[in-house]
Amino acid sequence: ESVAILADQNTPRTERVNLPFLGEEARIPTSLARFALKTDSPILPVFLLREGPERFRLVALAPIEPGKYADSEAGLGDLTAEVAAAMETGITYAPAQWFWVHRRWRAKHQPRQLIPGAPPPPPWGGETRP
């Protein structure tokens, strides 16, 4: 049996760690690592690459074995870091195909204030909201 998990989704604060990701510290979900450690299931990182109209290629990286992290106190964070490195591999291979809608780097990158003394722009990006 297999389970597919989108490992780059945003999660609650208690279910993520801050790790280097694409050159900056980012919030990385620990849920995939928790699941793998709890079930002793290998993680198979896969990426679907668009090659043309209605044409895709599935790329699989080497499996990540959770067993080597099971007895470590830092195991959850270390396994999460290995998952993040696998995501980086797929993203940097075809960066134009990575679609991200969450603010992964939100802690570091706050909106710039364009006019000194003016309030920051609304979080939804519009001028006004009913």
Label for each model-derived stretch:
Residues 1-130:
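Non-catalytic C-terminal accessory region of glycerolipid acyltransferases
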